[in-house]
Amino acid sequence: MKNQPLISIVVPVLNEEKILENTLKNIRQQSYKNYELIVVDNGSTDNSVNIAKKFADKILFEEKKGSINAMTTGFKNAKGEIIVNCDADSLYPTNYLEKIVEAFNKSEKIVAVYGPLVFIENGKISNFFTLLGYTIADFLSKVFTNTYIVGAANFAIKKEIYDKVGGYNTNSNLASQDFRLAKKLSKHGKVKFIPSLIVLTSNRRFKENGTFRALLHSFKLWFDVAFNINKITYDNYYTHSYYQKKGANKEK
């Protein structure tokens, strides 16, 4: 891998006009400049595409609903050596891409890196416990089940290896395809957790039931998936009802 590899950032979008501009502006403020920004529209009926035109290097369209399908389209068309997904409600620290490149340059054996997610709306104390809980959950999951607690919004992958393992399984209805992809990648090298590689994301998926209660529920489901990785279906996963309301029948 080159010392300054091209990174492809893929942003799946479905009716995100209220938040998309802020996210794309944030990406454009990265200190690392060798990247391409790809927005994949997943059937928006609002102004999302027009907003994307102001910032994206490339806009693609995927008719089949679901973020996995949109991500897959983006990654398939990506030119970068490293591919990264960014949710439309996520924000990167300014040095986020720099940290990713530093991690990959430390060892050729590293095929993917990932880190924790913390909430934009929460305070430092709340996010400290979120970060702590995420780190502990990931450690225990790897020790007992050899499963990585990976979230697509903070997951960087060598494209060559992603292509080699066949990427995401877009035909599966099993929950958390990111966990399964990480397992496939780990057969070809090291999948590394970096606690300091933080992405800020919105707690909007959790607001209905309260953030704390929803976090406990999501941690429980993560463990359920880790211990029963081929049994938990998406219909029972914690984001299902949220995405149903957005009109995505099989968002994963």
Question: Model segments located where?
Answer:
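Short, acidic, metal-binding catalytic loop of nucleotide-sugar glycosyltransferases
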Residues: 25-34
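N-proximal low-complexity "stem/linker" segments adjacent to membrane-targeting elements
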Residues: 1-26
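A recurrent flexible, glycine/aromatic-enriched loop bordering the glycosyltransferase active site
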Residues: 119-127, 138-156
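Short aromatic/hydrophobic "clamp" motif used to bind/position activated sugar donors
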Residues: 83
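Glycine-rich, basic loop-to-helix element that forms the pyrophosphate-binding segment
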Residues: 62-78
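A conserved acidic beta->alpha catalytic loop
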Residues: 26, 41-49, 90
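Conserved donor NDP-sugar-binding/catalytic core segment of glycosyltransferases
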Residues: 95-125
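Acidic donor-binding loop at a coil-to-helix junction in glycosyltransferase catalytic cores
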Residues: 174-181
